[in-house]
Amino acid sequence: MADFLARDYRSQGEAAHEMLPTFLIGKILRERIVDSIYWKEQCFGLNACSLVDRAVRLEYIGGQYGNQRPTEFICLLYKLLQIAPEKEIIQQYLSIPEFKYLRALAAFYVRLTWDDVEVHQTLEPLLRDYRKLRIRTNSEIRLTYLDEVVDDLLNAEVVCDISLPPLRSRLQLEDLDLLEPLSSSSDEEDDDEEQISKLESNEGAVDRNI
């Protein structure tokens, strides 16, 4: 019974990109996640609140390592896709400045499940977050930076062994009048800092709402 529940691919959220949110992670990687010890021992029964306790203990991001073992980061991302928290809760995850791996996890979730305009509006301010992160690959653990991870989420096709859904560029969205053009670099920096400040101002609401 426990093994059946661990392999439950359903999601509590609505379809994202015309599929179950959990199916945004490929079948092979999904199978490896639900077969992993971390998933079975640390992810079973998590909700939007208790997942935070796991996420703040993360020491690196990444997809798979060693003999194609899924990282704790990718297991929690899959659990997040199962839980499918409300957008306000994801914003609260992003608003806690001291927990950079939680912020990276929430940013990844946004990229996978939110619409193109929301992705740009939510992730672009994080390009001003230059803190160091560790990333685990097949052969090593190396340093990267949160802004570089966010840039990859906005521009790359594959991040942490996950193929990202198509994302229209900022320029395309501006041409469609769905996004306002970016202002000058100094104004843009001020706007980004203001957006991050707004995110962080929600920090006090986390305990009340998740």
From Swiss-Prot:
Gene Ontology biological-process entries: mRNA cis splicing, via spliceosome
Pfam families (UniProt xref): PRP38
Ranges annotated as biased composition (Basic and acidic residues): 195-210
Superkingdom, taxonomy of origin: Eukaryota
Keywords, in A-Z order: mRNA processing, mRNA splicing, Nucleus, Ribonucleoprotein, Spliceosome
Compartmental location: Nucleus
Family annotation (InterPro entries): PRP38
Region entry Disordered, spans: 181-210
Keyword match Nucleus: yes
GO cellular component labels: cytosol; nucleus; precatalytic spliceosome; U4/U6 x U5 tri-snRNP complex
Main location: nucleus
Oligomer status and interactors: Component of the 25S U4/U6.U5 tri-snRNP particle, a subcomplex of the spliceosome.
Family: Belongs to the PRP38 family.
Functional summary from the UniProt entry: Required for pre-mRNA splicing and maintenance of stable U6 small nuclear RNA levels. Implicated in the formation of stable and biologically active snRNP structures. As part of the U4/U6.U5 tri-snRNP particle, dispensible for spliceosome assembly, but required for conformational changes, which result in U4 snRNA release and the subsequent catalytic activation of the spliceosome.
Family annotation (PANTHER family): PRE-MRNA-SPLICING FACTOR 38A-RELATED (PTHR23142)
Name of protein: Pre-mRNA-splicing factor 38
Organism of this sequence: Schizosaccharomyces pombe (strain 972 / ATCC 24843) (Fission yeast)
Gene name in the database record: prp38
